[in-house]
Amino acid sequence: MQTTFVLVHSPSVGPSTWAPVAESLERRGHAAVVPDLTGVTVGGAPYWPRVVATVRAVTPATPVVLVVHSNAGFLLPVIKEGLGDQVVACVFADAALPPRNGLVTTAKEGFLPFLRDLAGPDGVLPRWTDWWDEEDVVAMLPDPAVRVRVAAEQPRLPLDYYTQPIPVPVGWDAVRCSFLWYSPPYDGVAEEAARRGWPVTRLPGLHLHQTVAPEAVTDAVLKLSRKS
């Protein structure tokens, strides 16, 4: 049975951040889906059950390689639990690593003052690309058309998306897990992945490198998941 690559974007951005890799996988004969998580905060907390339901709704009944980016890493354990034995491998692409078990929040305590300063009186944050200087966004998304597309689909998330406790089921990492490292802010995360005994591949770039070099990212995902 063919394996499906389920490419999970950070809820801070949108599905177009994985679309080029999905297209590359399909050109090579692999099945790929990109769940759209841009609506998961509609209706109030907790948000993670909607993430799980959204992923399950678009995932076929095949073996699955879960590929997560950025803060979607914290959601991987509950997504994996929702998909059950379908998941045969997990790839963290410049993504946060959850603990082995317990609870986790999307934002660390030290980052919350920055987020609180950004939030409006209604507790809603600007779009993620509006958090940063324009030159930094241009560096991450150098193609103007891609930059417009990514910016346009971003949701404005409530502050409590970043503070909600997300459960981390025991044994989520019993399958093959690996780390694809793009950017310098994730060097410590890559080191932690290596300490856990995971394969780590370095693909130098910025945080949205899958939109800039989708073929190279696809190569790395296939190798890390042993599907090349």
Per-region residue spans from a language model:
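Gly/Ala-rich beta-loop-alpha elbow adjacent to hydrolase catalytic centers
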Residues: V67-L76
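Active-site loop/oxyanion-hole signature of alpha/beta-hydrolase fold enzymes
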Residues: V34-V65, E81-G82, T105-P113
